[in-house]
Amino acid sequence: MDTNGKAIEIITGRYGKGTSFENNIVNSIFGELNTKEKFKLYFYWYNVIHELGHGIMAFNCESRPHPVIEEQFVNEIAVAFWLYYGEEEKINELSSIVSYALSKFICPAKEGVSHIEWAHENWGTDEVMNFNNYGWFQMNCVNDALLKRKCLELALIQAGVNNINVQPQKTLIFSKLEETTVSDIISQAAFLLREWGVVLPDVHNSFDNDPNRHMSKIIDVYSGGYL
């Protein structure tokens, strides 16, 4: 996709600003101990790169895969990015968060059916989009990416990035994760990924009071509308 006149908006849900029902959903995923810190690590640190991954696919992949496959790919990009640029302590904490969350979801798939197979079969139906089932699918995608530990170069090639220019490895340290940190994480990640050869337009972020609303959208900068 041509970047001219376009931008990426990454929308992130706020912790504790939703309804009691929405907030209770968060607590059920992350547990009652250090819930806010776990939420911020997952959504303010990890998931913003996941969402940026959708932007990478939109502007670099000539033929985007099925949404199920793209979800797996963008998690592999996010994990690969933080394995290359992240603090090991945060990667380990992410793994613990995902393991705990998976223990709380009820598996909707029959025995022997993978999360990818199940999602392919049910994509576009209410079966996928209820909270338990989509959460189970998404956390399995993250877990699979953590197990694969794919290198960043391969993850970007898989996303359709051409003429990759491998960059020096370094550690991006974010000692405190707050709403104000999110734009810094996104801007640093976008800068580094462009150095790798990734085609990206401007990337913006916004927040939503629903703690479960996390997504990325392509914006027409002339009309202000979503594409």
What are these regions (language model features)?
Residues 35-43, 47, 64, 68:
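Soluble non-cytosolic domains of exported or imported proteins
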Residues 67-90:
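Glycine- and acidic-residue-rich phosphate-binding/metal-coordinating active-site segment common to enzymes
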Residues 212-227:
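Alpha-helical solenoid repeat scaffolds
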Residues 59-63, 84:
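Hydrophobic alpha-helical membrane-insertion segments
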Residues 1-40, 55:
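Active-site scaffold of zinc-dependent metalloenzymes
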